[in-house]
Amino acid sequence: MHRSTILYALSAIVSLAYAGDFSKSCSSISFRSTSISASCDDKFGDSAGTNIDLTRCLANVGGRLVCRPSNPSFKFCDCGLAGDRSVLNCRCTDSTGTKKPTSIDLDSCLTNDGGDLAC
């Protein structure tokens, strides 16, 4: 029983290490259409390919991108990753139809959940 308690505590620590800041434990980060792909470390120290559709995580609010996992609406934006691969630079349409420049640090929206990208 003592051994299982230690294993549980260690897995909790590993989970906390991946909370937010996905780019610290993921590499080969790329963006295509509305998805981020990366190779992320899992809780065993192995690395595996994963991806996430940002329409589940981001919203275009008046031409500005925000993290919004509860009610996402990542529409009407043309985007690309910045040089550090964790910032998404976009031009998003506001309510008047005007394209506005906006960017968001994906480390504030995405997390590495045991090798899988999550909002």
Would you name each region that the model predicts?
Residues M1-A19:
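Fungal secretory targeting signals
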